Every structure is written in C-alpha cells, then in structure tokens.
Amino acid sequence: MRVFSKYCQLSFIVLLMTFTVAKAEMNEADSISPKQASEMYAEHKAVIVDVREDSEWNEQHIPGAIHIPLAQLNERLPELKQYKDSPVITQCRTGRRSAQALDVLKSAGFSKVYNMDGGIKAWDDAGLKTE
C-alpha cells in the first residue's frame, strides 16, 4: 500500500511539472518582441491593447494603442469585439500583466493574441515612438 501511495505521489508531481512546462512553452509561443509588434502595428495588421493603470498610461504610451486597465478588461471586452479575429498585441510595463491579459482574451475567444515581451519599457529601449 505504501509503494502504491508513493507511486501516486510521484505520478502527480511528474504530471504537474509537465503541465507547468507546457504552459510556459505556450506563453513563449504567444510572445513577440517590440520590433515584431511595431512592424505588425505599423502595417495595420494588429491592434495594441495597453493594460496598464491610468497613471502609467498618462506618463507614456504607444500612439494609437487602446487603453484598458487589466482590472477592467473582463467588463470592457465588448469594446474589443471587432478585433476578435485580428491580431491583438497585449502590452503593459514589463510584460506580466499583459501575459494575464493574453489569457483573458484567449479565454474570451480571441484567436490571435500576442504578448509583447518587456512591455513599454522594452518598446522605449528599442527607440520606438511613444507619446
């Protein structure tokens, strides 16, 4: 009985690690660089959704980006409905909140969602235009 219990515990740990690695790989596949985001955006092939707070947005933002703070994203999804089948790039300060936004949008049925690596900080460091 003890051997079976140990086997079950070990199996559970291996399974949990497998899902964790798979999730990390999925998020990596959904990430794009600021340069890639800029190119998609400039060619009107994508919309950028900035999920930072109002104070962060007012300080600096990407021209033409849609501003919806992460805490309001679920209730404001109807504002993004027209982009459901278009590429949507989520962006925040460093990439953490935008990764959460990516999950929200995918769960809501958005099919082409990307998280911009490094957020507005990486965009600015790349010398790309901000307001």
What is each residue range found by the language model?
Residues I48-D50:
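Structural scaffold elements adjacent to functional motifs in cytosolic proteins
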